[in-house]
Amino acid sequence: MLEARDISVKYGGTTVLADASLSLLPGKITAIVGANGAGKTTLIKALNGAVPISAGEILLGGKPIDSLTRSQIAREVAVVAQETESRFPVTVREFVLTGRFAYGSSFGWENAGDIDAAERAIADCELVELSGRLMNDLSGGERQRVVLARALASEGHVLLLDEPTANLDLANQTLMFRLVLERCKKQDYAAAIITHDLNLAAEFADEVVMMAKGRIVHSGKPEEILNAANIREIFNVEVLLDRNPSSGKARVTQVY
């Protein structure tokens, strides 16, 4: 479990995140939505201990995150950013194995546990046939699945995903969400995913957090949060909503 209690972040003298509280629970996916500049990425970085907080506290497994080393955090919290750092001239298998470096592994020095974790993650992300391919030769959707597999190989039980589906087509976006959902449900992982796709948030998330101007302004179940009034407030657009006929969940059908 990862919990933020009234946390704030300042850059210089400017507050970019204020009084944010949320809990990431085992087996649950939290979708974080909001316009550009709302503070979503800052929140993810704070939850990972990558940026210092100026107020409040963050607890990882009940322990203050600032009392833990970077290696201790990396063993429990895995981060997937937008498509970055994935064009190295290494194979898919080698790249996924870097997810084990927090345990003291390095290229050529992997133990059986490292290899087993990497192979499970490769299989879970449907990458077995690509495991010998070079990262440089993959499509954007394939590379993002590899980055997710690296995060899963770390076996940290908290996943933080910063717009992992940006620039992907709908099929690959849906696949990414499905893969995260499967890991959360099967192995009791907790996940927070930043996304601009409200329909994916409605379909896959257990909770939706809506942010604006560095604050969490709404949070709750998708059916409670994703309505026309809240979307107008956060994104300054008008939308039409109906129900997905297969799942019965809310979906945006028109933006104007």
Write out the residue ranges for each language-model feature.
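The feature captures the beta-strand-to-loop junction immediately N-terminal to the Walker
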Residues: 33-35
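Helix-to-loop junction immediately C-terminal to a conserved catalytic motif
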Residues: 48
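Conserved ABC transporter NBD signature motif
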Residues: 56-64, 73
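Conserved ABC ATPase signature
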Residues: 108, 134-138, 142
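Catalytic Walker B motif of ABC-type/P-loop ATPase nucleotide-binding domains
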Residues: 159-163
